[in-house]
Amino acid sequence: MINRVLIRTRVLQVAYAHLHRGELSLSAAEQDLELSLQRTYDLYLYLLQLIPSLTDFYREVLEVRRRKHLATQAERTPNMRLVENRLAAQLSETPELTAWYAGFGLRWEDDEALLRHLLRKIEHSELYQDYAHARSDSWAADQ
């Protein structure tokens, strides 16, 4: 989320840029600051949307693995913990985030290579292994 430290940083960046450009217009600096904060907020929402996009992509990957001709037992009955993550489900059901993402120009789904790379990193991480094999199934564990 946008916090005070980020706002202070943006204010100093905009003030520095306007000082070195020789512009002394307060209204122009204010408009630049508003634009900068809006872009930061858009980036924050875009990164939030990565979570449901990643779980949806993982669901598709698991389905492809399941339909493989010579699928192993692990591929036929995969661990669905990440696909059924409560945080991802709640984010995908948030109407404000869904509406914003529908109007935003970029899509995580368009960059399949990045999603595949992130999934590979996640699947091989020790943190994911602990999460996937944990006995407790709670909201706190999903976060």
PLM regions: where:
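Class I Rossmann-like S-adenosyl-L-methionine
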Residues: M1-Q143
